[in-house]
Amino acid sequence: DYPKLTFTTS
């Protein structure tokens, strides 16, 4: 989840 996991910019 990009909105939640901002560090995980897949």
Curated annotation (Swiss-Prot):
Significantly inhibits growth and induces an apoptotic response in HeLa cells through cell-cycle arrest at S-phase. Exhibits highly cytotoxic activities against cancer cell and non-cancer cell lines producing IC(50) values of 0.15 nM for human cervical carcinoma cells (HeLa), 7.71 nM for rat pheochromocytoma-12 cells (PC-12), 11.20 nM for human breast cancer cells (MCF-7), 15.80 nM for human leukemia cells (K562), 2.79 nM for African green monkey kidney cells (Vero) and 3.92 nM for normal Madin-Darby canine kidney cells (MDCK). This is Malanin chain A. Glycosylated. GO terms for molecular function: toxin activity. Heterodimer of an A chain and a B chain; disulfide-linked. The keyword Disulfide bond applies. One of its GO terms (biological process) is defense response.
